[in-house]
Amino acid sequence: MAHGAMGTTATDTNMNTKTMPTEPTTTVAFDPGTFERLHRAYRRIDPGDPAQAWHLLEALHVLGQTRLVPHARTHGLMLALAWRTRNLAEVNGQLLRLLLVPLGHLLGRLPLGNTGRSHVGAFRPMQVAPELLATIRAHQRPPTL
């Protein structure tokens, strides 16, 4: 395991780099099923409701940011939404973040809990907002008995 200023890096059996928190930042454990259910919910969003689309993408980012592929995939979706909504500041922010994702995973320096949007510092760890946590939990599969 390598240690970075914002977390500890390890590799799981799927060869996905993951970062585990070492600071008091609230994080959400990655679950591929929950990630895919959130992604499906995002794809079903009404194109005329960008606020809900951004909310789901922020939830996807918080959930997937400790894994390289889901993290990059989420920033790609954010870039596409920024382009569709003609938000040039967000387009530029997402282009920068897409370049930083591999480097952050390689160095194990990911700002856990960060929502991934351009109006938030790219290196700023954050507490997970209660509404994002509620959205993530709503898409978790209930335990089977």
Name the predicted role of every residue range.
Residues 2-7, 11, 15-65, 85-145:
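N-terminal alpha-helical interaction modules that lie
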Residues 37-38, 71, 75-78:
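TPR repeat positional signature
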Residues 78-85:
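Internal catalytic or translocation cores that form aromatic/hydrophobic pockets or channels
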